[in-house]
Amino acid sequence: QAASDSAILVNTDNFVRAETDLYKAQQVKDGGFSKFNHWRDFANTDKQSVVRSNRDTLYSSAVFDLDAGPVTITLPDAGERFMSLQVISQDHYSPQVIYKSGKYIFDKQSVGTRYVTFAVRTFANPNDKTDLAAANKLQDQITAEQAKTGKFEIPNWDQASQAKTRKALLQLNEGLPDTNKMFGTKEQVDPIRHLIGAASGW
């Protein structure tokens, strides 16, 4: 199927950026632009927003436009509870994963792209409503500050060629025994595995 005149064909050269933009656009649609959107319950495997998600983890995510200025994220003190902040660039690199409470500042230079996704994972016991409520309170204590709100402007990626490329990459993923070197910083990943991971590992 041919792309429309205004759509950009997607192939292995630009798939990582197109696929990452797709997920960021979904996060924006869900209300997570320039502020955190919190999932208060555990991911429904039929309706999860990413390919891989944990059943004992609550997710909070936000997309920011770093052209509008740096962002300060504050993680609360979670005590013994697992809480992490993953930073994801538009090129599906993860320049930082943070496990300690505190204030952290991010800008375009440190992230590497205009748009960034902040993904916070908070552990909760799926069989304990009291524990779930405590985890929800921690989610509410996650804060994000930016002097001004930016805009969300991404290319018009051609969905048909993007889907075709994704399907081919998922076929390549079937023979891989693990996800080693798919995710991490640019220096940590293997370029081919990183490309496959963009299709299989969101």
Q: What are these model-predicted stretches?
A:
Residues 2-202:
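A compositional/structural signature for long, glycine/proline-rich flexible linkers
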